[in-house]
């Protein structure tokens, strides 16, 4: 009787211990999955292009090209020497894929938006606000042909001052005539649409010339074409305003 009772107790303990081990394995598995997911986020999505090693401001863990410390998961500052192409993790090239830029921007902004850091440390909140603003600037610059070209010149230490007149007289005459056409289309929807289409074609051709110039490392040619793009972009903005005033819908 006593032996039977001991056996039953031993069996029950073994069953309980077995269940405990199963639960422990299950919890460990979940924990491992969580770490794997966090690592995937850190290594695949939340990275920028940099060769400079850094240390986490929160725990001093060494990391490289990661927005979140892989040790304590705290948001990190970006190195100051990064350009907009580095920030979005794309190759420095005038020819870009706007869809790729948009996807990367959305992924990063979704993780870096200040609303995500309401309950975090004050420094982390400030970093979030700074990075989110920087990301907006990078996106608006690289998705705009003129801004992208001017920014690439800026990276080479070249700028085009506002109000520059270093363009040939024939081109200035051409721009004056275009502006007169815009002025004469104030109440003419069809003319506004036609002028917008023509201007779009001109800007597209100029953009291709800029791409060729940068591809050939000809910054003087790129600068000359970008100056022309500035004038035609100004005309484009006037036509867009007219289009809105006249209630023209695409």
Regions found by a protein language model. Name each.
Residues 2-250:
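C-terminal accessory/regulatory regions appended to core domains
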């Amino acid at each position: 009787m006593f032996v039977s009772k001991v056996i039953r107790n031993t069996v029950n303990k073994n069953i309980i211990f077995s269940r405990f081990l199963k639960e422990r394995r299950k919890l460990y598995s979940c924990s491992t999955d969580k770490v794997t997911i966090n690592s995937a986020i850190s290594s695949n999505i939340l990275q920028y292009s940099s060769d400079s090693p850094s240390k986490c401001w929160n725990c001093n863990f060494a990391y490289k090209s990661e927005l979140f410390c892989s040790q304590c998961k705290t948001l990190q500052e970006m190195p100051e020497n990064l350009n907009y192409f580095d920030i979005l993790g794309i190759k420095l090239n005038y020819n870009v894929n706007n869809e790729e830029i948009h996807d990367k921007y959305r992924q990063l902004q979704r993780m870096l938006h200040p609303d995500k850091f309401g309950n975090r440390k004050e420094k982390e909140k400030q970093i979030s606000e700074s990075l989110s603003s920087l990301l907006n600037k990078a996106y608006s610059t690289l998705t705009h042909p003129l801004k992208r070209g001017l920014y690439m010149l800026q990276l080479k230490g070249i700028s085009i001052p506002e109000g520059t007149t270093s363009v040939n007289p024939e081109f200035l005459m051409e721009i004056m005539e275009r502006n007169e056409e815009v002025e004469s289309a104030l109440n003419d929807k069809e003319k506004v649409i036609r002028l917008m289409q023509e201007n779009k074609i001109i800007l597209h051709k100029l953009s291709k010339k800029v791409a060729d110039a940068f591809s050939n490392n000809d910054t003087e040619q790129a600068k000359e074409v970008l100056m022309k793009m500035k004038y035609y972009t100004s005309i484009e903005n006037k036509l867009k305003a007219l289009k809105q005033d006249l209630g023209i819908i695409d």
